[in-house]
Amino acid sequence: MNGHLCAQGVLPNIRLVNVPSHYKSDTLYNSNDTSIAGRYMLDEMTIIDETNPAYRLMDSVYANRKKHDPDNIGPMRFKTYDKAAAVLAGDEAVKEYITNEIGYKTNLFVMESISEAVVVPPNGKKETVVASKISGVKQPQFNIFLSELSNVSIYQEDIKYIGDTYLSPVNHYVRGNNKKYYFNIEDTIINAPADTTFVLSFRPLLKQDFNGFKGVIKVNSVDWAVESVIADFVKSGASLYDLKINHKFNKHPSGQWLPSEWLTVIGMANGLIAVDTASLTTPADSLQADSAYLFGYPQINVERYFYDYEYDSTLRKRDVGHIKLDMDENAYYKSDTYWNNNRYVPLTEEDENAYKLVDSISKEAHLDKLANLSSVILNGYIPIWIFNMPIEFMAMLDNYEKLRLGIGLETNSRLSKHISLGGFWGWGFRDAKAKWGIYAKALIDKRTDFRAMLGYSKNICKTSSYESIYSRANLFDPETYRYYLGSNWNTVKTEFVDVSIRPFSDFMFRAGFYVSNKKPTYNYQYVVSNSDNILVTRNEFNFTTLNLGVIFAYKEKFVMTSTGLKSRGTKFPILTVDYQRGMKGVLHGEYVYDKIEASLFGRYNVGEKGRFTFEIKGGYIDSDIPYPNLFVPLAGYSPITYFTPRAFGTMRVGEFVSDLYAYIFLQYDFGNIFNRKGLFRPSPSLVFNYGYGNLINNSLEKHIGIDARTMEKGFYEAGFLVNDLFGVSYLSFGLGVMCRFGYYSFPKVLDNLSLKFTVTM
């Protein structure tokens, strides 16, 4: 294409006949370089064949991906050694300066762990940390963090890492018109006859916007397995860090390609460390003439080594179970002799110095206590000596009290690892009344998450709900606002006992016994017949109930922590069933009834951007009971308000009531379909909600003072949202509108509309 022709050896004169159309025909004489006159000039260009051979290679890798997936090998046992070291990256002069100030080379932080793992296809993998060592602190949550950082495989379909999801080039390169990655063969290495290693570069295709990778992958032609991959994470939006991986695989005598050495590098380029160049004793090569500072930044290097592979046909599903990451109780107490004999690779000089430096600082600055403080705060508590102060009791918002300020205290593990005693007190500003409660909690068995709780409270609760001490979700959860949506509130005095247990991997069972007195805060009267068969009204009600429930979450995985099991979720829908039996004549109970509710909730990623969320709910009450325990839909109408998933955004508070209901909530998020970069990345979303409700065993005439009706004709609403319209730092804001239609729509169009705003991170 650049116009140069070369003929080697002794050749006679050559007559060029079939030359490209943009050159003239001519005779070349066997002499020095000769130029061929051009008719016209063309710019140089590169033409790529539509049948790119690199894609044919990736077809074979894709077809064999399950065979070589590290989570799909076995049944097998193996061990891993993990080491994470925080180092200072950036200008060498900065690192030199830090070394001179301290007096020796050192890393900023180091932690290690040794784990024993089992893999039983198709049930997955379980790791047990048998040894752990962390400079300065002894906190189990760091081992969970280390495992999450080092447990990323290029074979995973959707790679979840530090809160984001990335599309693997092995699973998502996709042929045809929907290709996501471009591949190119860079080199071919002949290992032996019929054994070749292909070196391919890859990157996201231009004009594609998704979280992915770019780098180099080596593919073996015999087994079509990945030999190694070196890649940078490519994030579509703003990022707080830079990520790189370097994974190597070795061929086992069995013929299986197994992980050998994995390296993950996390560069926190936004955490700059500046050094005044005037303080440097030696000039820096990278120093610019007009620069007064040099910069470095923290970087975490996470190494994982796999060894002692052993196939074990005796392994069964129960050997994996539902605990993905377990912790040996003696993991933190291994001797130096143990580490010297079992550490897979020796520590560097910088690693050893980091232990000495950080341990000495920890004794002076009490880093272990600070680490414990951060852990507890992330779990919703502030530790004070032998007490924890639950954050949720400090400030609460709802549409009845408007604002409640208070305090809560409960004993922590420093007093007892299994039993906790606590209480709370709060003051509601709108109703000018105090709420309080006392309780005791017990963690009976961590492995089955067997827990018990009993207590007494004087609080408020929404109509149709029964609630114990805890009633608020994490303030940082976008669905927390569901709790604050409008409802008819009741004052409630409750004595209760709750137990829950997870005896099997996919099931959690719970049971509770409640004795409660409810009094509506609104003007409500319930019509009943007295002993003389005369109709009277009441506005205070006593309930004694037995509550049973089960949650089925297929293949839900957990990690073991010091406080019990923590869920890592499941990709399958979650089924929840709750049953309540009202008992008359038992501890002042006045009503006998059966109440059952069930819900099916699921969330699925569609393609590389879309996400579909659904919930189907239903419930039934077989008897005539007061309004506070009937079913009331979650209504969230206001002319302008926050969008709340799985709630009726155009329904008024207390507008409908039922003892038989069925709800459907659907939402589809398209993602950043416009492939915009930066903070303006509009992401449209469609919402559809349906509700049916009726009073089968009750009559509206018996409920005086409520302006409610049934919705047996079907309630319909739909909405259109645009998320990420504009952003501030790492928060994005959006707008949308919900519209009510169908039989229960209002004559005025504006009454059917509700403007919504959204907030995402």
Name each model feature, range by range.
Residues G215-I217, S221, K244-G255:
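Extended lipid/amphipathic-ligand handling interfaces
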Residues V17, Y23, A37-G212, T281-M396, ...:
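Structured extracytoplasmic
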Residues V229-S236, Y241-K251, P259-G271, L421, ...:
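Strand-loop-strand
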Residues L5-G9:
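Boundary at the C-terminal end of the N-terminal hydrophobic targeting segment
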Residues P75, P193-S201, A225-I230, Q256-E261, ...:
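Short, hydrophobic/aromatic-rich segments at coil-to-beta transitions
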